[in-house]
């Protein structure tokens, strides 16, 4: 019996929010050396939390592993996907935020509005872009239809296979903008 030893780094996928709740969408893909974050949202409180403006994820794991954080990728510009960015960047350094054009403009406005002095590098992406993160991840994007223009899903190719997140989407038979790219999503 032979034993194969793999030099591939195991991949962890976890949510800091957004599962079983509406809002706080923040997902991470991590290997031995890298963390990429997909979306950084807030949740708006229910009536049982008077005086609370936003509910944000617990960033402890990211703070404890901050040197591994390589990028934040945004699927679209709704608050439950971008509203946590000012809070996240006050806890950890984010080297670069990749976002579609509309979301990038909304993020810049939000950071100005909250008077956050940190320099944040924001790079706009399109459906045709490929972004390489170290030797671990290659990220590409596909158009989706949603209630806000400029919405995308994200494909992350890893040594272990492909991870796909759709962000928020709906199948719209008469979209106002570009139609969902089902072929690229598959």
Show which residues each predicted segment covers:
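His/Asp/Glu-rich metal-coordinating catalytic cores
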Residues: 2-73, 78-186
